[in-house]
Regions:
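Bacterial N-terminal signal peptides that target proteins for export
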Residues: 3-15
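Secreted/extracellular ectodomain signature
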Residues: 30-161
Length: 161
């Protein structure tokens, strides 16, 4: 080969390298675009239930629905049950409404599988309840409906009966 001339092989390797780098760069931009418009884990489902009644049949339906989603999606679903108003009694140690023990046990079981139970702080104040009055898996939020709104703004699907 003469000095100053580039071989066909060198030219081919250079073009191949440029093509690979351009393809990699484009694919990274496409991936970045995809993740910018989705949650960190785009396959995860997010549900927030509003639990605002103490009726045992109603509580049964909500807990059954949450359990079915857990069975179907396992780790691919994040569930929050926002308890406010009379619904708060489900997660109270000494509920003021007649709540069947089996429903509290079911709520406890769901909590062990990752279902979060948020207790409305305003409702707690109106009942004269403190943190010690709740079952251990419950998390207090200042305003229950505000918590539900914020979860919706984070992409949670709102479910209410």
């Amino acid at each position: 080969m003469q000095p100053g001339k580039v071989s066909n092989r060198s030219r081919y390797l250079t073009l191949l390298l440029i093509g690979l780098l351009a393809g990699f760069s484009t694919s990274q931009r496409l991936l970045a675009h995809h993740t910018d418009s989705h949650f960190e884990d785009s396959s995860k489902h997010r549900i927030v239930y509003q639990l605002n009644k103490a009726d045992p049949a109603y509580l049964q339906h909500v807990l059954f629905s949450a359990g079915e989603l857990m069975r179907k999606y396992g780790d691919d679903v994040e569930i929050v049950i926002g308890a406010l108003g009379p619904g708060l009694h489900l997660i109270g140690k000494l509920p003021g409404h007649p709540i069947p023990t089996e429903l509290q046990q079911r709520a406890s079981s769901l909590a062990q599988y990752g279902v979060a139970f948020h207790a409305c702080g305003n409702t707690m104040k109106s009942l004269g309840w403190e943190e010690k009055d709740l079952l251990p898996f419950a998390k207090i939020v200042p305003i229950g409906i505000d918590d539900i709104m914020q979860l919706q703004e984070q992409g949670f699907t709102y479910i209410s009966w």
